[in-house]
Structure formats: C-alpha cells, structure tokens
C-alpha cells in the first residue's frame, strides 16, 4: 500500500488530480519548490522537502532532493530486514511513490539561450530520484509520464495497489526516457560528427497501421530536439499517414526544397516521376503531371510554394495519396478537403543539412547528407551549352540526386521529361529515361559514364547537352562521341549515388 509519495514536476499537467486522489487515500505527500507551492495554493496538504531533510534548498536549486533521507527512503528494499533496520535507525521513512518529470532540456536546447543557460536545464535531482525508484520498482511506483496518472489511479481504486507488471513497465519507461534525455545532452556537449558511441534521442510520434507491407508492424519516431520538416508538419485533411507515405513525403519535400524557383515534384515509391520548375504553381504542376501521366496516379505531389484554388481543382481530378506544400489558400483547402481521404500536409520547415543513416544487420551507417551539388564545373567538349541548356543541366542534376542509382534524367525547359533509375547499369537507365522522355534537350547523370555508349544513345534521341561528374578512365570515349555528334558536355566533379 502506498503511504508516502514524493512529487516534484516541471510539467504540472494532471498533477492536482493525482495529488488530491492520493490525499483522499491518506497518502502523505512530500514536494519541492514550485510543485510544493502549486499544490499548497490549490488546497493539497503537502510537506516541504526541507521538513524531511532538515536541509534548505541550495546552489540556486541545484541541490534539493540529493539527500540520504530521500534516497534511503526510495531505495530501501521492504522485505530486507537489514535495510529496514538501517532506515529506522537513521530516522528515514520509506517513500512508496515518486512522481517526477524532468527539466525540459529537449525544448530549451533549441531556444535562443546562452550555453550556460541551456546547461541549467540539465536535470540532476530528477533523474537521480527516478532511477532510484525504477531500480526499486517492486516497492516503489515511479511516474514520469502524465499519461500514466489515470491508469495508476484506476489500479489503486480497484486493488488498493499498483500491480507488479505495471510497476515494471513504469520503471522501464524511466530508463527509456533517461537514455533519450542523456543522448540529447551528450550530443549537445560533444558536438562531434561521429562520436565514439552513437546515441539517438527520438520519441514515438504515432503507431502506424503497418510498415511497408501489411504483415510488418511499424511506428514513427521523431527527434526530441530541433526543427525538421518531417517532425513539424501539420496534417490538414485526410487519413492517417502510413510508413510508405512518410518515406515518400520526405523525398518529395527534399526534392522541391532544392529549388529557389517555383517547383513541383510528383513521386511514387520513393522515386520522382515528374519534376518541374516555372513561374506559377499551376504551371509547374501541369508540367510535372505531363512528365508521366501514368505513374503520378496514387502518388504524392509536393510544392515549394502556396497552393491556389486553380491548382487544387486540378489536383482533385486524379487520385493522389498526399499533397504537401508550405501553405494553401483557404479556397484551395476547401477544394482538397472534399476528397476526405486525401492527406493534405502543410510543411513550412525547409529540408535541413544533416546526416543520413542506414541500418544494416548489426550496425548503422552514418554519413553527411548529400547537400553539395557541384564541385569543379567545366565544359569538356568543343561545343558549350547555351544559357537555357545550362539552366536545364543544373535542374537535371538537382533532380537526379533523388533518383536511385544508376540514374539518368532527361530535361526540356525546366521539366524532367524522362527519369530512369534503379538500374544495375548506366546504359539501361539512359535508355529508360530517353524512351520515357520521347524528346528532350539535355541529359543529367548521377555518376560518370564508364563507356561511350550513353553518349551514343543520347545522340540518337537528339540530346544537345549532357552533365555528369566525369572521372572515368574512359572519359575520352564519351567526349569524342559528343564532339562527333555536336553535343556539349559538362563535368561537375561530384557524384550523386543514391542506394
């Protein structure tokens, strides 16, 4: 039976209901600082922790609960006669429940505060108490999540106690929380790209219906610190997002964020099927749609500008899973909401420079994100691209980096007319892209040409300019073909493999 509880919380949500319930069952409540004041002002009978420890709060609140009279009461094993004898001799009363949530370091680390101010939000007393309570979960109930209050109240009402299964789960939540909390602090202090231990701090956002396929369970976790597009978006309409939806939305959003110009990306199965830039949202959607009239069906469409009513009306004509944009005109949103299953996503955060991670069996690969488009751009052929061709070449290179390797993109007037990707050799990717395009002006490749065959194939389809990293031992073969066919070719010096 719970006879004594210690309550010390930063987040006061639900704490009055819990405290008043405990009080109604004659539980003695000990509290600290702001929590003590909050409970007392709201009519809860509460004991200041100083009355228990006989020691005042000190060092600007850094030392409040770090005291044997507190931790002895938490850690004493009730059925250990020696433990109980010691705490009785020392005048220590057992503490049966610990209710603590931590200083909000996750939030404060991203605020415009000085380094020293952020350090002050590293909680010490709270973690020490909850770790102690979690270790002794057979005798102590520990609550760190406001969502657990109601369940614990119900169990006590029904059984006069909290069952051991619940206690164990609550203890597990402590160490789960602390691993994320400590990871955030560690990353803040270390500021290392590749630390000795990789500790990640993510919190479950939602349980997903399933993973890539219906037989796979899944959940979505978001970073506890920082602002990121796939963390801070807002769903304005439609069904719940799926595992595949979120993966696809991420790539579609990253693609349109590559461009300063008005841009649209249509995407299916994590691969762009239509990308375009232009002067208006309606123009770029029309161009992206025309890139691939078939594949866009059931796909995702992303914009880097606000969507207007005219564009929304056109979007509503076909089946789409998601439309994502920085914002939507009110009348545009009304149109899209008529399709109750269409997920309409408002995403204002730009795609961020950071790291990419890939899980393998027994490890995680970590790398810097591919945020560098060009290295040492130079024309390597007798003929140079025109100004418009050069614009299309750069556009093509921005698109091709989001297509699975081997990847080729054929472009005409700011429109990715043909996209070939995921092929095990480059010539197949080129043939796929050229065939899909039908006609095009320039061709972009994510990696160098190992032979002259891609240039030969491009010439057959009337390509006028090519952009590729260069660096093959047979570069001269491709250069020779281009010179013979009157094609200009640009080397960028940087590769964009995507696996």
Swiss-Prot record:
Segments forming domain MGS-like: 1-144
Keyword annotations from UniProtKB, A to Z: Hydrolase, Multifunctional enzyme, Purine biosynthesis, Transferase
Entry EC no(s): 2.1.2.3, 3.5.4.10
Pathway participation: Purine metabolism; IMP biosynthesis via de novo pathway; 5-formamido-1-(5-phospho-D-ribosyl)imidazole-4-carboxamide from 5-amino-1-(5-phospho-D-ribosyl)imidazole-4-carboxamide (10-formyl THF route): step 1/1; Purine metabolism; IMP biosynthesis via de novo pathway; IMP from 5-formamido-1-(5-phospho-D-ribosyl)imidazole-4-carboxamide: step 1/1
GO MF, one annotated term: phosphoribosylaminoimidazolecarboxamide formyltransferase activity
PROSITE patterns given in the database record: MGS (PS51855)
GO biological process, one term: 'de novo' IMP biosynthetic process
SUPFAM superfamilies per record: Cytidine deaminase-like, Methylglyoxal synthase-like
Claim: Phosphoprotein is one of the keywords in the record: no
Reaction equation(s) it catalyzes: (6R)-10-formyltetrahydrofolate + 5-amino-1-(5-phospho-beta-D-ribosyl)imidazole-4-carboxamide = 5-formamido-1-(5-phospho-D-ribosyl)imidazole-4-carboxamide + (6S)-5,6,7,8-tetrahydrofolate; IMP + H2O = 5-formamido-1-(5-phospho-D-ribosyl)imidazole-4-carboxamide
Matches recorded under Gene3D superfamilies: 3.40.140.20, Methylglyoxal synthase-like domain
Keyword Transferase (UniProt): yes
GO cellular component: cytosol
Pfam families for this protein: AICARFT_IMPCHas (PF01808), MGS (PF02142)
Family according to the record: Belongs to the PurH family.
Domain notes: The IMP cyclohydrolase activity resides in the N-terminal region.
Protein name as catalogued: Bifunctional purine biosynthesis protein PurH
Lineage of producing organism: Bacteria, Bacillati, Bacillota, Clostridia, Eubacteriales
Name of the gene: purH
């Amino acid at each position: 039976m719970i006879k004594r509880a210690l309550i010390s919380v930063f987040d006061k949500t639900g704490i009055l209901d819990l405290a008043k319930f405990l009080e109604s069952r004659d539980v003695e409540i000990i509290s600290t600082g702001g929590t003590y004041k909050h409970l007392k002002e709201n009519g809860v009978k509460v004991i200041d922790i100083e009355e228990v420890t006989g020691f005042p709060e000190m060092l600007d609140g850094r030392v409040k609960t770090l005291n044997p009279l507190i931790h002895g009461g938490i850690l004493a094993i009730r059925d250990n006669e020696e433990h109980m004898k010691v705490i009785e001799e020392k005048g220590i009363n057992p503490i049966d429940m610990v209710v603590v949530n931590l200083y909000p370091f996750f939030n404060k680390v991203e605020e415009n505060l000085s380094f020293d101010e952020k350090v002050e939000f590293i909680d010490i007393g709270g973690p020490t108490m909850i770790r102690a309570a979690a270790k002794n979960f057979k005798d102590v109930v520990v609550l760190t999540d406001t969502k657990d209050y109601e369940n614990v109240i119900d169990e006590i009402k029904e059984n006069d106690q909290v069952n051991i299964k619940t206690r164990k789960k609550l203890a597990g939540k402590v160490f789960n929380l602390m691993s994320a909390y400590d990871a955030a602090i560690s990353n803040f202090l270390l500021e290392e790209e590749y630390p000795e231990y990789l500790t990640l701090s993510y919190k479950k956002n939602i349980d997903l219906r399933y993973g890539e396929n219906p037989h796979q369970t899944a959940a979505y976790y978001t970073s506890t610190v920082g602002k990121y597009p796939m963390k801070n978006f807002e769903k304005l309409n439609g069904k719940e997002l799926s595992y595949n939806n979120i993966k696809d939305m991420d790539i579609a959003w990253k693609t349109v964020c590559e461009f300063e110009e008005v841009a649209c990306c249509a995407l299916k199965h994590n691969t762009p099927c239509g990308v375009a830039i232009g002067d208006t949202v309606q123009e770029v959607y029309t161009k992206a749609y025309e890139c691939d009239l078939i594949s866009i069906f059931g796909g995702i469409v992303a914009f880097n500008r606000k969507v207007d009513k005219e564009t929304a009306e056109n979007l509503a004509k076909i089946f789409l899973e998601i439309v994502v944009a920085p914002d939507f005109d009110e009348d545009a949103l009304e149109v899209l909401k008529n399709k109750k299953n269409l997920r309409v996503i408002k995403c204002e955060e730009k795609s961020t420079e950071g790291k990419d991670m890939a899980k393998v069996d027994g490890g995680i690969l970590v790398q810097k994100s591919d945020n560098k488009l060009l290295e040492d751009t130079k024309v390597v052929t007798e003929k140079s691209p025109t100004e418009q061709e050069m614009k299309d070449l750069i556009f093509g290179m921005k698109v091709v980096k989001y297509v699975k390797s081997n990847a080729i993109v054929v472009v005409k007037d700011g429109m990715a007319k043909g996209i070939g990707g995921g092929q095990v050799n480059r010539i197949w990717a080129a043939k796929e892209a050229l065939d899909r395009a039908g006609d095009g002006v320039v061709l972009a490749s994510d990696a160098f040409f190992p032979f002259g065959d891609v240039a030969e194939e491009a010439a057959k389809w009337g390509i006028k300019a090519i952009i590729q990293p260069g660096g093959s031992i047979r570069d001269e073969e491709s250069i020779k073909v281009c010179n013979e066919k009157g094609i200009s070719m640009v080397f960028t010096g940087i590769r964009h493999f995507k696996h």
